[in-house]
Amino acid sequence: MPTNFAAIVPGKNQSLVVQEAPYPTAGENRIVVRVHALAVNAVDYATQMMGETLFPWVTYPLVLGEDIAGEVVAIGPGVTRFKPGDRVVGHAVGTNSNNSAEGAFQQYVVLLENMASPLPHALEYQQAAVVPLAFSTAIVGLFQKDYLGLQIPSLTPTRTGKTLLIWGGATSVGCNAIQLAVAAGYEVITTCSPHNFDLVKSLGATAVFDYKKPSIRDDLREAFRGKTCAGALAIAGVVPQTRNEAAEACLNLVAESEGDKFVALSMPAPPNVPDGVSCKFIFASTVKDNEVSHQLYGYLGEALAHGSFIAAPEAEVVGTGLEAVQGALNALKQGVSAKKLVVTLP
């Protein structure tokens, strides 16, 4: 049996420590994956710093991390989509389950079968690792029935005649959401900084606006004139003012437009929600427990192989080995735009 090492959080607000960890076994409907690349996310350093203050169920020591790409080394009972040797990309849910065996920051990790997709050989592990958490966040907000409940994507989509607002199109979640919504038959209007306009248009957005312009709300209102709104997905960073502005702009746009009156939020709802409009905070790991993960992680493998879904944003490899993960988290705290920080494992 191989030796497993992990970058472990020993306690709240403590730096990661690389040490030997138990070698995981594949339980029912689960696979064990040898990690070749992992990405870091804001939720990782937030959990590291805040622990049970952020997620009451968190106990230490704990292996954090959500995004991995690697090779299947074992499958558990009931697994039908994968076999040892398969290349995969997947969402590790250890933070949600408080189970270190399911955390990404280690050499061997357990994934749920329905939270993983086959990875075509043309796509490198390090680029694939940017996808999972952002993908899960997007599919919860877009397709779960208790959120926007949009039509499911297809390689041959049927146009719905509806237009969706995605605030934060150049974020990791936004890059996934634009592609998914277009593949589901929706027109997408989005926002980002001007230097990322070409990126979001290449992913399928038909119109894009600078979210920093004082006229942004008027610009969006005019863009949606005469269109049927499918609702909105509001994605923003960790700065409270930016998050509030994003939520309020989306809520007001939906309230003033014809069509669906729902906004999926990556931030807490603001205090004043317009009458007739509903909104809900997105918690990505909820998708593991419903049919949307089965449908969409199945679709992801097909779309990656077909070339109709691109692993975006760009991966920036900031180190090799588990010892580099803490540095990646520190770098992420300083702010990143239109890229995702990745660590490769030898």
UniProtKB/Swiss-Prot annotation:
NADP(+) binds at residues 43-48, 170-173, 193-196, 211, 251-252, 336-337. Pathway: Secondary metabolite biosynthesis. Pfam families: ADH_N, ADH_zinc_N. The keyword Nucleotide-binding applies. Substrate binds at residues 133-140, 269-273. Keywords: NADP, Nucleotide-binding, Oxidoreductase. Induction: Expression is under the control of the azaphilone cluster-specific transcription factor azaR. Its EC number is 1.-.-.-. It comes from the Eukaryota. GO terms for molecular function: nucleotide binding; oxidoreductase activity, acting on NAD(P)H. It is an enzyme of class 1 (oxidoreductase). Gene3D superfamilies: Medium-chain alcohol dehydrogenases, catalytic domain, NAD(P)-binding Rossmann-like Domain. Belongs to the zinc-containing alcohol dehydrogenase family. Dehydrogenase; part of the gene cluster that mediates the biosynthesis of azaphilones, a class of fungal metabolites characterized by a highly oxygenated pyrano-quinone bicyclic core and exhibiting a broad range of bioactivities. In the first step, the non-reducing polyketide synthase azaA forms the hexaketide precursor from successive condensations of five malonyl-CoA units, presumably with a simple acetyl-CoA starter unit. The reactive polyketide chain then undergoes a PT-mediated C2-C7 cyclization to afford the aromatic ring and is eventually released as an aldehyde through the R-domain. This is Dehydrogenase azaJ.
